[in-house]
Amino acid sequence: MYVSYLLDKDVSMYPSSVRHSGGLNLAPQNFVSPPQYPDYGGYHVAAAAAAAANLDSAQSPGPSWPAAYGAPLREDWNGYAPGGAAAAANAVAHGLNGGSPAAAMGYSSPADYHPHHHPHHHPHHPAAAPSCASGLLQTLNPGPPGPAATAAAEQLSPGGQRRNLCEWMRKPAQQSLGSQVKTRTKDKYRVVYTDHQRLELEKEFHYSRYITIRRKAELAATLGLSERQVKIWFQNRRAKERKINKKKLQQQQQQQPPQPPPPPPQPPQPQPGPLRSVPEPLSPVSSLQASVPGSVPGVLGPTGGVLNPTVTQ
């Protein structure tokens, strides 16, 4: 393996105190060789240098790599292309001399590395994404953008034109209310009748409010109109007549004074009938006198007889 070769090549590179401290056995035969990867134009050289640097940092108590590195530039990414073998070799040499290959290559972390970088122009290059993100951030944050964001948006936008939002994020333009609302007058044409046509139609309307099918065909052929136009004219004329009659009725009701309501009907009273003579009942004395013939009216005696009246002189 290439790592074993580097360890056996230069023994003076690693201090003996560190190499043999703690009874650590780091013989080359104890290491398991990793699987070989296909050649990607200098990528295996960088991987071997990184493995050697990790081994060196594990054995020596030297200072570790810094936690954060500066943001890589777009020009530095060209070293990972197939044509960047020279830059990778320089990074390996820098790592063998005690430096950090990652710092020499100029990237902060392995996550920032893009192994499938294409140098030629591609229609779906990820460089177009920051323009959409910058436009979205400007929409969420209404404050003035910083100079760095403005410069990045102008640099990444194609043709030097600044794009605030992506096409699929743009809000559709609202049409004006006048263009959305349509009336019948604008959609359909309006027929203008001549004086002769109106006169003949008025004559027919006064003769009959509802025209027959036969008369409608004859009138349409005479006036040079279609049957549909004649039918619609009669419909409009009847609506106009109803409107005129309603207006006249309202005017008459306003001119006449309001009449008081009639009194409610009273229930019928019973009428008195014709007077009839009722016979008076007879007294007991008169009935007795009437029953005795030749008797003189008088008073009954104690014996039950009739007392004759006495005449005094």
Curated annotation (Swiss-Prot):
Residues 228-242 are annotated as: Interaction with 5-mCpG DNA. Transcription factor which regulates the transcription of multiple genes expressed in the intestinal epithelium. Binds to the promoter of the intestinal sucrase-isomaltase SI and activates SI transcription. Binds to the DNA sequence 5'-ATAAAAACTTAT-3' in the promoter region of VDR and activates VDR transcription. Binds to and activates transcription of LPH. Activates transcription of CLDN2 and intestinal mucin MUC2. Binds to the 5'-AATTTTTTACAACACCT-3' DNA sequence in the promoter region of CA1 and activates CA1 transcription. This is Homeobox protein CDX-2. The gene is CDX2. The modification Phosphoserine is found at residues 60, 283. CDD domains: homeodomain. Residues 257-273 have a biased composition (Pro residues). Keywords: Activator, Developmental protein, DNA-binding, Homeobox, Nucleus, Phosphoprotein, Transcription, Transcription regulation, Ubl conjugation.
